[in-house]
Amino acid sequence: MASLLQSERVLYLVQGEKKVRAPLSQLYFCRYCSELRSLECVSHEVDSHYCPSCLENMPSAEAKLKKNRCANCFDCPGCMHTLSTRATSISTQLPDDPAKTTMKKAYYLACGFCRWTSRDVGMADKSVASGGWQEPENPHTQRMNKLIEYYQQLAQKEKVERDRKKLARRRNYMPLAFSQHTIHVVDKYSLGTRLQRPRAGASISTLAGLSLREGEDQKEVKIEPAQAVAEVEPLPEDYYTRPVNLTEVTTLQQRLLQPDLQPVSASQLYPRHKHLLIKRSLRCRKCEHNLSKPEFNPTSIKFKIQLVAVNYIPEVRIMSIPNLRYMKESQVLLTLTNPVENLTHVTLLECDEGDPDNINSTAKVVVPPKELILAGKDAAAEYDELAEPQDFQDDPDIVAFRKANKVGIFIKVTPQREEGEVTVCFKMKHDFKNLAAPIRPVEEGDQGTEVIWLTQHVELSFGPLLP
């Protein structure tokens, strides 16, 4: 019975750019293509950036300037939990009369889990609750900025050279109207510069004088190459003999979370600005319709569009697994659940020999030969005890039980291997009423919803074989 909750035992095959097998709860269904979609075959689009602690929302440009981190929230450098601001009272001398003191509020950062505080690393307390915390300076900041500036200029030069070669090849085919426009150069660092097209009849040799910024003197950035050091500083003599206090040594994770400083001791751990999270939309690459689109507000957990597959495709689950033995036929109980409100007709089919999708099967399966009818989903009917059940004239050898929009069926499994996991594969053919807006106008007498038949490849894992 526990297998009923183990949805990862039942995998659906997605026929996308690459074949993906995943539980139905991790898949999406495109109503326009009428196909399953996984995270591997959709386009991911960033809608908004927000801080998971203070829920501050910011546009992408601002998030890029802040290096995708929140300016007001911090993570503990020891245990990576969110730091909270604590207030305390300290006595300070009055500027007019040094002999007298007054109480003043001071704020510091503290972790409620590992008890780390900003005072442990010598950070001064602040008179305001937010902002202005002391941050360690990276000793290599100037070198990195110089390298970034150099490679940005190098990318612009390469872009100009490529455009010059393109114009040289096309100089005899450029029309007059086209030659009066400009080319907008966008390099890999998202920096743009505009190059003026040559006048009609002008020689292409005039392009040789083009600079990166027309009308401006572009100063060439020069960098000093890194120098290899022949001699390195030796380790202290007591490096291998002195006792190590593990509480004062940082872990590998703590060092990798601060790659610019690489702290060795716990006294060098400084708080890190909290990483921003994103709300993203998923779009089908084939028809470019949205499969998932969340609300813009960070406090909202609702979705404007959420085409998850469990709301459209019948779900198969394993209810009970008997003792499976080599070359002995066993009866397995499965459940089929109809997620839509209308009747759904389902037919289970065995995989053909030589089926390229049937590569993981290790057992022979016998599925019900008859068509199964699943009742529509009705949330109110589940609590109505006086509702009369529908008579579907089920065969007791095939259907074990029926309740609301769920039906239990028997399949027969015969393992074909002496050891290993028992896996069976079959095809599930079902009808689907496409509720998406039709492209053509609906004529009089024509049905508004189109009924189509879909086929899903399902793989069931029953666990290890008994001896």
From Swiss-Prot:
Disulfide bonds: none annotated. Belongs to the dynactin subunit 4 family. Keywords: Acetylation, Coiled coil, Cytoplasm, Cytoskeleton, Isopeptide bond, Phosphoprotein, Ubl conjugation. Residues 152-172 form a coiled coil. The modification Phosphothreonine is found at T414. One of its GO terms (cellular component) is cell cortex. Subunit of dynactin, a multiprotein complex part of a tripartite complex with dynein and a adapter, such as BICDL1, BICD2 or HOOK3. The dynactin complex is built around ACTR1A/ACTB filament and consists of an actin-related filament composed of a shoulder domain, a pointed end and a barbed end. Its length is defined by its flexible shoulder domain. The soulder is composed of 2 DCTN1 subunits, 4 DCTN2 and 2 DCTN3. The 4 DCNT2 (via N-terminus) bind the ACTR1A filament and act as molecular rulers to determine the length. The pointed end is important for binding dynein-dynactin cargo adapters. This is Dynactin subunit 4. It comes from Mus musculus. The modification Phosphoserine is found at S203. The keyword ATP-binding does not apply. The keyword Phosphoprotein applies. Its main location: cytoplasm. PANTHER family: DYNACTIN P62 SUBUNIT, DYNACTIN SUBUNIT 4. There is a cross-link at K222 (Glycyl lysine isopeptide (Lys-Gly) (interchain with G-Cter in SUMO2)). Part of the dynactin complex that activates the molecular motor dynein for ultra-processive transport along microtubules. It is found in: Cytoplasm, Cytoskeleton; Cytoplasm, Cytoskeleton, Microtubule organizing center, Centrosome; Cytoplasm, Cytoskeleton, Stress fiber; Cytoplasm, Cell cortex. The modification N-acetylalanine is found at A2.
